[in-house]
């Protein structure tokens, strides 16, 4: 039997790594469009600032094609480079498009009509066509300019410092909209918190803030252009310098890159952090064994992908689908339950997915609450802690946990309650019990008339829900709350694996019956000792 299990472990790992074989066929080269990118060989701040505004207008233009916008983005992202023509070669590594570099020397009469280099093959008609694109600004932009301040384009940027100020401000906004361009394009393109952070740090000048519509158009252009995202990935790798003496631009790119790394892989890394990182004995459940092998294979698979693995979402890599939490739903549900107790930042993460198992989520919550005072034996041994030190630490953690709660009440962290999150009465030292019974859900739309009776009346609401008068103890007590709260079994010295597994099975069965009892009194509660039925209780989508 052991040989079968070892073979299964090797098979699971090989199944994830087999796509990395060296004998895989070379993909067929597809037809590539030609993208024209304007570059400047001199460092004149006046000409470079004009090229910056020209590229912004091409991105906003009503009549510009996707290739025009991609070329304008590449030129915009290369403006800080002293040698734009050489820097743009990074985009030539992309298999998505062919890059045509067009050298220009300036603009005619402070307009958006470019002056091509003498060696350029750009015709006069093409020059006039690009000028028309730059002038065709959408009506959704106020004052026919991408900036909030309508006189920014009239400024004279005759100093390098002034040009770099506007250049870095615009580029940082482009990098900010990149953070969610692939994972959440329906949300506002710019995070208010990120904008406030970089303005406070002096990396974005408030005078050069773009209009929200301009930020949205830049995000759409980045989302639709694979070659631009390839170029930005190369820039992110260049910013990962081990030296602390980096130039200002790449220091900013490296900072914003932390928000882009592992985008779309939050479920995988949070499962590793809270599910495996805590190393609590609940992981010994037999139901977790198969998914633990899957997580082990995924960790090896991630390491084999190299440094580009952090940007799989930005690169639209199909390998990102290997790491979705639906491949390990029980471990994911258990880890999310732990995370909601230990980390307040988890409230900002949308973990309520269709594959979230309620019972294992509850198991994670109960485990985290009962293990908050537990001591890691390995770390305690390294620190030389005695048994008295461990007991004192556990007591301190328990006091701190109770002191943070309202007196005589325990919070409910029900992820399925939505806007109806509430507190349930109970003693401060009791373990709270989740109640998914919809009869206990407070409603605000069940009134007798459309007049003054629709105003929320706490006393009437309490009587309707059989909760007594406001300020009085709750009269409605479910059977679940009256039942005992079994402690999570702990594996003691001398306990065999079978005994510990049997104890955990009994605990899961008790939890299951406890939560299900209030929903269906006629349900068949008879379960086999070796086969625990974990059914979803209630409607998750409600």
UniProtKB/Swiss-Prot annotation:
Chief site of localization: virion
GO molecular-function terms, A-Z: RNA binding; structural molecule activity
Localization per Swiss-Prot or TrEMBL: Virion; Host cytoplasm
Ranges for region Homomultimerization: 1-294
Biased composition (Polar residues): 472-498
Gene Ontology CC terms, in alphabetical order: helical viral capsid; host cell cytoplasm; ribonucleoprotein complex; viral nucleocapsid
Keyword Plastid: no
Keywords tagged on the record: Capsid protein, Helical capsid protein, Host cytoplasm, Ribonucleoprotein, RNA-binding, Viral nucleoprotein, Virion
Region annotation P protein-binding 1: where it falls in the sequence: 295-402
Similarity comment: family membership: Belongs to the paramyxoviruses nucleocapsid family.
Subunit record text: Homomultimer; forms the nucleocapsid. Binds to the viral genomic RNA. N0 interacts with the phosphoprotein (via N-terminus); this interaction allows P to chaperon N0 to avoid N polymerization before encapsidation. Interacts as N-RNA template with the phosphoprotein (via C-terminus); this interaction positions the polymerase on the template.
Annotated protein name in UniProt: Nucleoprotein
Gene: N
């Amino acid at each position: 039997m052991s040989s079968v299990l070892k073979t299964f472990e090797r098979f699971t790992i090989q199944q994830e790594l087999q796509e990395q074989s060296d004998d895989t066929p070379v993909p067929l080269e597809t037809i590539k469009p030609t993208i024209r990118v304007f570059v400047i060989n001199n460092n004149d701040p006046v000409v470079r600032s004009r090229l910056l505004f020209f590229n912004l207008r091409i991105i906003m233009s009503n009549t510009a094609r996707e290739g025009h916008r991609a070329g304008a983005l590449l030129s915009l992202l290369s403006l800080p480079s002293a040698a734009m023509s050489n820097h743009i070669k990074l985009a030539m590594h992309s298999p998505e498009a062919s890059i045509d570099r067009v050298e220009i020397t300036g603009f005619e009469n402070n307009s958006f009509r470019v002056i091509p280099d003498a060696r350029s093959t750009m015709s006069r008609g093409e020059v006039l066509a690009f000028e028309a694109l730059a002038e065709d600004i959408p009506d959704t932009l106020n004052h026919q300019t991408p900036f909030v301040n309508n006189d920014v384009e009239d400024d004279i940027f005759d100093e390098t410092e002034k040009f770099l100020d506007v250049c870095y401000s615009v580029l940082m906004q482009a990098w900010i909209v990149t953070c969610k361009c692939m994972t959440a394009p329906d949300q506002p393109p710019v995070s208010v918190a990120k904008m406030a952070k970089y303005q406070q740090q002096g990396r974005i000048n408030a005078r050069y803030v773009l209009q929200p519509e301009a930020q949205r158009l830049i995000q759409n252009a980045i989302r639709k252009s694979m070659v631009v995202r390839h170029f930005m990935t190369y820039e992110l790798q260049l910013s990962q310098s081990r030296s602390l003496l980096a130039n200002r631009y790449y220091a900013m790119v490296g900072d914003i890159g932390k928000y882009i790394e592992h985008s779309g892989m939050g479920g995988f890394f949070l499962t590793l952090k809270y599910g495996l990182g805590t190393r609590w004995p609940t992981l010994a459940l037999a139901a977790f064994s198969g998914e633990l092998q899957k997580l082990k294979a995924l960790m090896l698979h991630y390491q084999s992908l190299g440094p580009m693995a952090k940007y799989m979402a930005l690169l639209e890599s199909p390998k990102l689908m290997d790491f979705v939490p639906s491949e390990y739903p029980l471990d994911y549900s258990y880890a999310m339950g732990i995370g909601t107790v230990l980390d307040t930042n988890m409230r900002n993460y949308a973990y309520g997915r269709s594959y979230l198992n309620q019972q294992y989520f509850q198991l994670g919550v109960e485990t985290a609450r009962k293990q908050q005072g537990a001591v890691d034996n390995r770390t305690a041994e390294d620190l030389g802690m005695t048994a008295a030190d461990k007991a004192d630490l556990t007591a301190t953690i328990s006091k701190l946990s109770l002191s943070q709660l309202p007196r005589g009440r325990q919070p409910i962290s029900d992820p399925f309650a939505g806007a109806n999150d509430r507190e349930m009465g109970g003693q401060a030292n009791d373990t709270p019990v989740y109640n998914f019974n919809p009869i206990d859900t407070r409603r605000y739309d069940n009134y007798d008339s459309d007049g003054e009776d629709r105003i929320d009346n706490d006393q009437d609401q309490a009587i309707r829900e059989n909760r007594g008068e406001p300020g009085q103890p709750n009269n409605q007590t479910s059977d679940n709350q009256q039942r005992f709260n079994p402690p999570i079994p702990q594996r003691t010295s001398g306990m065999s694996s079978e005994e510990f597994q049997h104890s955990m099975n009994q605990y899961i069965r008790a939890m299951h019956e406890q939560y299900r009892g209030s929903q269906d009194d006629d349900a068949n509660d008879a379960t086999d000792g070796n086969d625990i039925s974990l059914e979803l209780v209630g409607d998750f989508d409600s």
